[in-house]
């Protein structure tokens, strides 16, 4: 017997039915904002993620050397891949570029609630504009997608920050000390809520801050008063505060400002983030970890050898999103749905298949017996797949040129002329023919 690998999951049809509904809602919402679907490879060069995603990613990669001696990895995230794609055809692509993609990713990390080694995300990205409305549109897409799933303002919140505020405050507090590892300090901020206070301060001191500097830095992060932050910081902070305010104003214009709160302790751990960053959380706190996050990464395209191209994106993950939806009671029902089951009795398959073909032409879900089962077994199967209507094609009925239509919810049934079904109805029900 072969066991399933730790951190990997099987999805049987009922669960996939619910997952497909959620993915469809995410992708449909993205389409309504003008995002176009792209497809991406499963393997990329290992070095691309080591170089672009930052410290710590290398130990999480499912990496190996292929038969050609190339170091490759199963992709752990999508942003470097879509950045490479933009560079490959940068001159031919109309700006702004708006892409969406849903696919699996792989990271060898600690398995816990809402976190697996194979996981699925819907990535939504905009390339080619630094206008704050682009950041706001990413936030608006995310908010609308969650609302379309049935969530409300009491269910989720976006905690919004700006990487330049963090780096500018670090520079101000340390008097532009060149020995400060700004990226390491920001990675420490990203871990702040997940580790003990002593460990967090230890990471800041490891990044070059003194104890007093680390304390002052952390005190500033806990304020949401942008006026105070602007007076304390340098010109970088002042500019970043203005940009963050512009994004929040645009978010208000798009009608989703109620979901956004300033939270300077939000940092995002990947090194390529540059400007506005945000994370989505369960507003009740019951789901403690971040549901998903995103932000601006204006330098990534240029670092791949392309023309300077601002970019911003978000990536809702299905695993943590399912926890939020289940907590709020809006996760889709995990059960099969079937429009019609055609039950055959005796040598009636030619008539049954004709009816099935005509119903399927109109996009109905139709099953027909393919196992030569008894009447009772077929009815039991129809019930197990939640068939709404059972069409009984029996030899005796056909002698009278009739078939039986049974409503599985009410149990009512009636006979109709076989040539009259399905007739002019795309999806005829018992009520249509009675």
From Swiss-Prot:
Reaction(s) catalysed by this chain's protein: tRNA(His) + L-histidine + ATP = L-histidyl-tRNA(His) + AMP + diphosphate + H(+)
Keyword list, A-Z: Aminoacyl-tRNA synthetase, ATP-binding, Cytoplasm, Ligase, Nucleotide-binding, Protein biosynthesis
Record GO biological process: histidyl-tRNA aminoacylation
SUPFAM superfamilies for the chain: Class II aaRS ABD-related, Class II aaRS and biotin synthetases
Region (Disordered): 412-434
Major localisation: cytoplasm
Superkingdom of origin: Archaea
EC nos: 6.1.1.21
Any one GO cellular component localisation term in the record: cytoplasm
GO MF term list: ATP binding; histidine-tRNA ligase activity
Cell location: Cytoplasm
Pfam families registered for this protein in UniProt: HGTP_anticodon (PF03129), tRNA-synt_His (PF13393)
Catalytic EC class: ligase
Record bears the keyword Iron: no
HAMAP family: His_tRNA_synth
PANTHER family, sorted: HISTIDINE--TRNA LIGASE, MITOCHONDRIAL-RELATED (PTHR43707:SF1), HISTIDYL-TRNA SYNTHETASE (PTHR43707)
Family: Belongs to the class-II aminoacyl-tRNA synthetase family.
Name by which UniProt lists this protein: Histidine--tRNA ligase
Gene symbol of the encoding locus: hisS
